[in-house]
Each structure stands twice: as C-alpha cells, then as structure tokens.
C-alpha cells in the first residue's frame, strides 16, 4: 500500500467538509420529493338528473330509472309522481277514445288494472307537470266568455304566460319521462282553453295572426285580459275648406290636457275641427270604439285645400265593440255632417300593413297656385320665368314658418312640371307637379331667398 494514501477509515479534510454540507440537508442527504403523497384517482360520479327532493312521496320509493312513456312502467312512474289525468294523457303517448282529462283517466285505469299495488300508492296531491293548472281551465273559459260576450268578433288568439320555474321543471321531467313528441305545458294549456271556449261559443276561429280579439292569460294570478284589436278603413278625402288641420291640434296654452283651458274653451284643441275627427267621429260612434288614429299619405298645410281625387288615408279605429258596418252609409253620414268642409270616397276595409304603405309612399303632388303681384312685369316675362322652373331641382332651406319644429338644413326637391300659366291683371295662376316634400309656398315667394 502506498504510504502516501490515507487509510480506508480515515477521512480527508475535503470529505469532512462535504459531510458537513450533507448533514445540513444538501446534496443527496435529503430528497425534496419524499413528502409527496400519491393521489388516487377518484371515479367521477355521474351527475344525478333529478333527486326527487321536490316531491312528497310519503316515504315510498320512486324508480327514477324507469323507461319513458308510453311504456307501462313509464306511465306507472308518472302516476307515482302525482301526475294529473290531463298531463298523463299529454305525456303518455297512447291513443285513447277521449282526450284531455278523460283520456288521462282511461290511461290511469289501465295502469291500475295492470298493477294492483299502483292504485294503493299514495301519490302527491300537486301535479309536478302543471301544479294542477288544468283544474282552472273551466274557470278561465268562463271569464273569457263573460268578457267577450258583448264584443263583435270572429277570430281569437290566445296568449298564455306561465311562470318560468314551472316551465323549466315541466320541461325537465317531460324530456326524461314523457313520450317523444309530447306537447309542452304552455301549448297544451292554450289548446285546452281553446277547446273549452269552442264548446261555449259557436263559430269562433282561433288564429295565429291578425285576430279580432287577443286573449291574454296569466297562469300565476289566473287573470284574463281581452285586447280588442283595431279595425282599419282605407279611403280618400278632399278638404274643401281652409283652416282645418289634418289631425287633432292640441291647444298651445294647455297642451291638450283633458279638462282643457279658457283659451280652448275646455276642448283641449287649438282648432275645433280636424280632418281626423270629421271622418273618425262618425266611425267611432257606429263601431262603439274608444278612439281613432289618422294615417294620411302626406299632409297639406292648414290653410290649403285638397281637391282633385283626394288624398289617400287609413283610419284606425281603436277597441271597437262592433267590427263591421255598411261603409256606404257611414260615408254618407260623414259627408253630410261635415257640411261642405270635407268629402270622403273610395272606402274599403283594410289592415295594418296598408298603414306602412301609406306612410312610406312618397307620391308626387300637384297644386294649382294663384297669387297676386303688386307691380307685375310684362306678361311674357312672367310666363317665361315660371315655365323655366319645369324640370328644375330646387335646393330649399327649411322655411322660417316651420324652423321651430324642423331641422335647419337644405333639401333638394324636383319640380316635375309646370303648365297652364295664366296672367290676369296683377294675379298669376299656374299648375305645378313636384316631388314629395317640396315647400310649394316657398317656391312661389322664395322665403327671402331661402
């Protein structure tokens, strides 16, 4: 052995220094991963679809894994849940001679015949699918008949509001246990009400669009509201007298409040007559309605007459108890009562869609204008100057007379044609056809160059 080498049990200074570090927790003396604990994988528990806590089962066991209807076990399970006869029929998925409550009763009887113990099962009193809502169908039908008995109608539409939590609960149970294609609660309840109304009222048609009456049912409070839909009448009017606005003009002093003021003598109107009321009031009385709205194809100024064939309009009669009448008779009454102020013609029944057409149509308008000139120039100059405007596109700034209610901007409007220019002493008359929206008065006097 080499005398210079250290003995086996002897340690060199370098080794002693290393051991000090090792015992202090460095190097391989301590494994930093020794404190890790192996975690066993837990099996994922399948989420329970429904735990049945909302149902009173009187200590009896319900089989939540039963097959859906129309299987006999599925129908038996729905009976154990406390399903009412009406809901049992709509989710059972089986044909029966009767429908509704009687159909469900026959399915229940068949289930009892198959399983004698099922009849002794103490099911909850409250149906989990409708919360016994179908028990109130007769009550609701009675209210509908009472509220619509004096109203003229041929078609109804039923709208039902069901609490959201009941809709969700019913949908959850029906999706799991009902027969495929079963009718949802809201649709089934609406159908039951319609069936009940049909048995009480002859000749009633249930529609999804444009009903005469809209029946609104709140299933939480069992409140029934009847919305009487308006009727619409198309026609044309000729305004023969000046000083009549097209629609009601509220009083400037009291702003049209119901009791009015001294300025309007309690009427709430700036002008006692309007085209709207001269036409609408006879219709309101004949149809026993609450009010009217007037929709004209454009409008003329209050001091302007409307002649020729007349201006198209649609009269909306709101909440009428009577929905049909002889239009010719009413037209004669309107023309007679107006005492030469207006005349109407071409009346016919229409619908709301024509209101949009009337409002959106930008029809050209024709005027016959007559004005005077203090110091008229030569007749040839007048005729030439006016005739040269035919076909010209005007750039009109908002007139001063309407600047308080219209945006101040420039509008381009075309003069389609000008003809029949006549000069008589200091008066000039001509006919003009121009684009919708043209300020005709300002075309004549220029509104100080605006």
Located regions from the model:
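Non-catalytic RNA-recognition surface used by pseudouridine synthases
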Residues: 2-435, 439-450
């Amino acid at each position: 052995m080499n005398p210079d080498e250290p003995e086996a049990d002897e340690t060199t200074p370098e080794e002693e220094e290393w051991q000090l570090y090792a015992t202090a927790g460095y190097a391989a003396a301590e494994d930093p991963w020794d404190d890790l604990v192996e975690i066993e994988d837990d099996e994922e528990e399948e989420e329970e679809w429904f735990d049945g806590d909302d149902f009173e089962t009187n200590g009896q066991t319900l089989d939540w894994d039963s097959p859906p209807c129309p299987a006999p076990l599925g129908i038996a399970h729905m009976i154990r849940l406390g399903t009412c006869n009406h809901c049992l029929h709509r989710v059972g998925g089986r044909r029966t001679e009767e429908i509704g409550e009687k159909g469900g009763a026959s399915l229940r009887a068949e289930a009892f015949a198959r399983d004698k113990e099922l009849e002794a099962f103490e099911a909850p009193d409250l149906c989990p699918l409708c919360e016994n809502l179908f028990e109130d169908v007769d009550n609701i039908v009675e209210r509908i008949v009472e509220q619509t008995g004096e109203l003229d109608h041929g078609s109804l539409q039923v709208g039902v509001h069901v609490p959201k939590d009941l809709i969700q609960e019913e949908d959850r149970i029906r999706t799991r246990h009902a027969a495929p294609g079963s009718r949802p609660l809201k649709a089934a309840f609406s159908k039951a009400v319609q069936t009940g109304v049909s048995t009480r009222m002859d000749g009633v048609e249930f529609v999804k669009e444009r009903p005469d009456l809209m029946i609104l049912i709140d299933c939480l409070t069992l409140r029934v509201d009847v919305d009487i839909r308006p009727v619409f009448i198309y026609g044309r009017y000729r305004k023969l007298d000046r000083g009549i606005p097209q629609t009601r003009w509220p009083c400037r002093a009291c702003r049209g409040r119901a009791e009015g003021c001294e300025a309007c003598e309690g009427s709430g109107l700036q002008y006692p007559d309007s085209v709207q009321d001269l036409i609408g009031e006879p219709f309101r009385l004949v149809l026993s309605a609450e009010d009217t709205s007037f929709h004209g194809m454009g409008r003329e100024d209050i001091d302007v007459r409307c002649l020729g064939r007349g201006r198209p309009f649609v009269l909306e009669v709101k909440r009428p108890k009577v929905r049909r009448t002889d239009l010719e008779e009413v037209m004669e009454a309107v023309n007679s009562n107006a005492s030469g102020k207006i005349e109407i013609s071409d009346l016919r029944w229409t619908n709301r869609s024509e209101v949009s057409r009337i409002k959106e149509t930008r029809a050209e308008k024709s005027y016959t204008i007559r004005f005077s000139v203090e110091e008229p120039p030569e007749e040839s100059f007048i005729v030439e100057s006016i005739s040269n405007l035919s076909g010209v596109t005007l750039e009109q700034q908002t007139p001063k007379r309407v600047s308080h209610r219209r945006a101040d901007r420039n509008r381009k409007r075309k003069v389609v044609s000008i003809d029949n220019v006549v000069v008589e002493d200091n008066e000039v008359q001509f006919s003009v056809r121009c684009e919708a929206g043209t300020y005709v008065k300002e075309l004549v006097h220029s509104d100080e160059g605006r």
